[in-house]
Regions:
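Alpha/beta-hydrolase fold catalytic core
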Residues: 1-11, 31-34, 73, 142, ...
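Conserved HGGG/HGGXW glycine-rich cap/lid loop of the alpha/beta-hydrolase fold
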Residues: 2-49
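Conserved loop-alpha-helix segment in the C-terminal half of the alpha/beta-hydrolase fold
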Residues: 188-231
Length: 252
């Protein structure tokens, strides 16, 4: 999706087992005033791919190539969940084209030894990806809704061949690369956070003034933190007005 005119350009990247349609409220608003871009990553939505291509490194390279091909300048990269890693990786590859980054309800799936982080993530899947995906996504919502059910069902339907490879590779990237990626960001960073995730994958809602290890890490790299309370993991869908307000204020 590539619509709208106006600077600065905004590029939106979805999360694990998700699609660009998760940005529907943001795309509808910002295409009126900005050039907006949203893509389906390999193996997601309408974009084909092979399991060996599913990694944060591949996705970041794809987004960086898209930025170059569209000749975006002073762009703001906006990622949700896994998309936070992707925009950080893309910004590392094309730093001169990126003015800032917005990270929406990001987290860290692995730390310490990358091999151990990847192995632990594979063990968590346990050979039953649909059950893993349902457990993972059910915990992202605190209130029942038709939209929540649809997002969980989409994740369960997603390719086990992709998901069972991508999740461990994401944990490995978190352990190996997140600090260096944050250190190379030249532009500003805004974190819009609504939940904290534990090692058991369980999420808890955040209140204003609360923090988490992930947010403390971001603060150490100069990020601005904004808490959106009483909201699940899909902050941009559950609290679109607040998210859009924060994006509009930051991306100037």
């Amino acid at each position: 999706m590539h619509e709208g005119r106006g600077a600065p350009p905004l590029l939106f990247v979805h999360g694990f087992a998700c699609a660009h349609t998760d940005w529907k409220f943001q795309l509808e608003q910002f295409k009126k005033t900005h050039e907006v871009v949203a893509c389906d990553l390999r193996g997601h939505g309408a974009t084909p791919g092979q399991p060996h291509e599913c990694s944060i490194e591949h996705y970041g390279g794809d987004v960086a190539a898209l930025i170059n091909n569209l000749e975006l300048r002073n762009a703001f990269l906006i990622g949700h969940s896994m998309g936070c890693r992707v925009v950080l990786e893309a910004a590392r590859l094309v730093p001169k084209r990126v003015a800032g980054i917005v990270l929406i309800d990001g987290s860290r799936a692995g730390s310490g030894d990358p091999d151990a982080a990847e192995s632990a993530a594979r063990a968590a899947i346990g050979g039953n990806y649909p059950a893993f995906a349902e457990n993972l996504f059910r915990r992202m919502f605190f209130k029942p809704s038709v939209e929540a059910d649809a997002i969980v069902a989409r994740a369960v339907r997603s390719s086990a061949a992709f998901g069972a490879e991508l999740w461990p590779r994401m944990a490995r990237w978190d352990a190996a690369m997140v600090e260096s990626a944050l250190a190379t960001v030249r532009g500003r960073i805004l974190a819009i956070q609504s939940t904290a995730r534990g090692a058991d994958l369980k999420r808890s809602p955040l209140k204003p003034g609360e923090t988490s290890p992930w947010l403390e890490l971001l603060k150490s790299y100069g990020a601005r933190i904004e808490i959106v309370p009483d909201t699940g993991h899909f902050t941009q869908l559950e609290a679109p007005q607040r998210v859009n307000q924060l994006i509009a204020e930051f991306c100037r």
